[in-house]
């Protein structure tokens, strides 16, 4: 009986480790996007007139976003980390089923953020236009690859 129990436990260890790894990947992914939101939020608020436009602050937030886009997020999208696999994530399995489409959405985001940086310090009107483009890339990706909550 002990051997059966031991064999069962030994067989379960890799599955438990994989589950823990998947949960860590999801937490890291959430952390990355929390940083994106932290930097993008004030830019969106300035663009909408919800807070006063501040060229220096806008440039700093935009620069930080550019820095975040230089991070290779591939480790944040390990197979087995969709909403079908792990609780607490909104990532659709479509991310892995349509990897090319997902990457194209990511590249559109990176390009929009690159265009945001020079616009951020140019004035509220210029910032608003660039923020709209970045926000559009976010929405486009969420529409296709994020579970609606």
UniProtKB/Swiss-Prot annotation:
Q: Which residues bind heme c?
A: 29, 89-90, 138, 141-142
Its PTM note reads: Binds 1 heme c group covalently per subunit.
**Annotated GO CC locations:** periplasmic space
* A GO BP annotation: electron transport chain
- Keyword field contains Electron transport: yes
Q: The organism sits in which domain of life? A: Bacteria
Please give the function described in this protein's UniProt entry. Cytochrome c' is the most widely occurring bacterial c-type cytochrome. Cytochromes c' are high-spin proteins and the heme has no sixth ligand. Their exact function is not known.
Could you give the subunit structure recorded for this chain?
Answer: Monomer and homodimer.
Name-wise, this protein is Cytochrome c'
| Species classification | Bacteria, Pseudomonadati, Pseudomonadota, Alphaproteobacteria, Rhodobacterales
Gene behind this chain?
A: cycP
